[in-house]
């Protein structure tokens, strides 16, 4: 899959809450850097974190606003909205830096405006 497609597919899969398909997109040694958490290394650790995040936000949907790509790296500007498990509305805006290696996502780093919810 070309890098441009995998960057979009990552968010499509997240919106569908398809953990199995997300695992197919990740390199076995994928790294995730997320505000207020320690770095996570390895596909299993990343997927475990995503599962926890999805439980905290039973409704959460991302909309890609723009993608700035340079080779196997991209900065994806997004907005999101949803509801947390206490049924409180949630919305945010941010950028996710993604990098691929051998056709799989190997690096994810999130930056967003509102970190108070975490």
Predicted regions span which residues?
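Hydrophobic beta-strand positions in extracellular immunoglobulin-like domains
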Residues: 80-82, 100
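Amphipathic alpha-helical repeat scaffolds
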Residues: 8-12
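A solvent-exposed, acidic/Ser-Thr-rich amphipathic alpha-helical stretch
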Residues: 28-70
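Short, cysteine-centered beta-strand-loop-beta hairpins and adjacent loop/turn segments enriched
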Residues: 82-91
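Short, well-ordered alpha-helical segments enriched in acidic and aromatic residues
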Residues: 16-29, 33
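A short hydrophobic beta-strand element
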Residues: 72-80
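Short, surface-exposed coil-to-beta transition loops
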Residues: 61-62, 77, 90-96
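Short beta-strand edge/turn micro-motifs at domain boundaries
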Residues: 93, 97-116
